[in-house]
Amino acid sequence: MKILLAIALMLSTVMWVSTQQPQAVHTYCGRHLARTLADLCWEAGVDKRSGAQFASYGSAWLMPYSEGRGKRGIVDECCLRPCSVDVLLSYC
């Protein structure tokens, strides 16, 4: 029983430490930004749809979300300031 408790404690500690490590942030601008985003989206298997494809579904509630992330763009988030891969993936 003590060994199971020790293993559980060790696993929970390892999991906690791995979640506490900060994700690397970099500045991406110009071609580097475009290539990195294209590579990440391709690896993630994201098939970005155009606004016309959303309109073909005819769902009025989808239209406000087809504009993307609003006023802040990828350049604001990843070129003017460093950003993580998670932020880049959110633009796929």
Swiss-Prot record:
**Which residues belong to the signal peptide in this entry?**
1-19
> One short Pfam family name for this protein?
Insulin
Q: Which keywords annotate this record?
A: Cleavage on pair of basic residues, Disulfide bond, Hormone, Pyrrolidone carboxylic acid, Secreted, Signal
Q: Which residues form the propeptide?
A: 50-70
> For this UniProt entry, what's an example GO CC term?
extracellular space
GO MF terms here are: growth factor activity; hormone activity
Q: Which residues carry this modification: Pyrrolidone carboxylic acid?
A: 20
Q: Which cysteines form disulfides?
A: 29-79, 41-92, 78-83
- Compartment(s) of residence: Secreted
Q: Give the main location.
A: secreted
Query: What's the domain of life for this entry?
Result: Eukaryota
| PROSITE patterns in alphabetical order | INSULIN
Task: Report quaternary structure and partners.
Answer: Heterodimer of a B chain and an A chain linked by two disulfide bonds.
Q: What else is known?
A: Silk worm has two kinds of PTTH: 4K-PTTH and 22K-PTTH; there are many forms of 4K-PTTH.
Indicate the family of this protein: Belongs to the insulin family.
What is the documented function of this protein? Brain peptide responsible for activation of prothoracic glands to produce ecdysone in insects.
This protein is called Bombyxin A-6
Q: Which organism is it from?
A: Bombyx mori
Query: Could you tell me the gene encoding this protein?
Result: BBXA6
